[in-house]
Amino acid sequence: MATSSFSIIKVECWPVDIPLTDPFVVATGTRLVAENVFVRVTLSSGAQGYGEAAPFPEVDGENRESCLGALRQLGKAILDRSAADYEGIGRLLSELAPTQPAARCGLETACIDAYCHGLHIPMWKLWGGADVRNRETDITIPICSLDKTLELAREWYGRGFRLFKMKIGIDVGEDVRRLQAVHQALPDIAFIGDGNQGFSRDECLAFVDGVKRFDGTLALLEQPVAREDLESLAAIRRDTGIPVAADESVRSLEDAKQIIAHGAADYVNIKIMKTGVVEAREIAAYTLSSGLKLMIGGMVETRIAMGCSFSLVLGMKGFEILDLDTPLLLAEDPVSGGFEYQGAWLSPWKLPGLDLFAQPPNNVTVIQRH
């Protein structure tokens, strides 16, 4: 057992409800409220760190109750371990809860944040600090009516956003009409079409043809078809000439290897909620070494989880497309400190860890030695 100042002596977790400004509708489900879990880890030195579990049941099968249940068990498993061994902790959590990546992610993030506080360094410095600069994110527009799509597009355009991630995948004709309306209103923007597995191969090809007919700029197709249909992903790349990003298809390092072996994508979308932080870094490094490109996104997250993802961008090289926008879709911000948004741009922070604080409620779950 670790006896250093980095020894984990307490884990706390509590549920948080954060309403969204507008319904978050994608091909696989709808969110009105982010039902997440915050985690806080305390070390023997007194250093504390925060993490967040942001399950999206339609995507990963996890929900808040399953996350809380997993965290109660996983928290016990890491008591007295050294947060300095965050890689070993990540591997242990993967072995103990292979089907609970969001819960693991929340606990991993809190351990790493606490460790960085103990070292008095920003989290991005732990990953090398190779690319510390302001970075631009896209903005997500959910599946909604034509009028609402235009309203949101004009609002975000006015706030400085120029890359619009359009949720698609339910109705090809309606998807094309929505993009065309935005293109006509705001001709200098570019699109990411995010299908969330909603299309068949033929539907995706029809969608791309429709966008090409009105000369829309389609920068990327993200996960247009089912996660296991690597053949169609490869065919869509070949037949459209549009870069393809694998999202739901990559939930592990082994998945990333399969994507690369099948020539199924140009980009891999890194999400710490799919894999935990340690494996996300491994996937990112492998992707780059294999000649593919990186984007990074998230579930419906606050600036805790999104800050951890941004730390990877700042610490490692190679993240070309940032989809780190969901805190902007929330009606309130339950955390203080940390990175800041300036329009479409994310600004790094300089203080230790994630430089974030969240106030626990009275009904927090506490895991510690008695």
Locations of regions flagged by a protein language model:
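Active-site mouth loops of central-metabolism enzymes
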Residues: 133-148, 168-169, 200-201, 245
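Metal- or metallocofactor-binding catalytic centers and their adjacent structured scaffolds
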Residues: 10, 42-118
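Glycine-rich, aromatic-flanked loop segments that form ligand/cofactor-binding clefts
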Residues: 109-141, 148
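Catalytic domains of carbohydrate-active enzymes, especially glycoside hydrolases
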Residues: 156-164
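Flexible C-terminal active-site loop/helix
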Residues: 3-20, 36, 300-370
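Conserved, mostly hydrophobic/aromatic
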Residues: 8, 39, 46, 107, ...
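Catalytic core of soluble alpha/beta enzymes
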Residues: 166-305, 331-341
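Structured beta-strand/loop patches that form or line metal/cofactor-binding pockets in enzymes
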Residues: 2-48, 53-59, 332
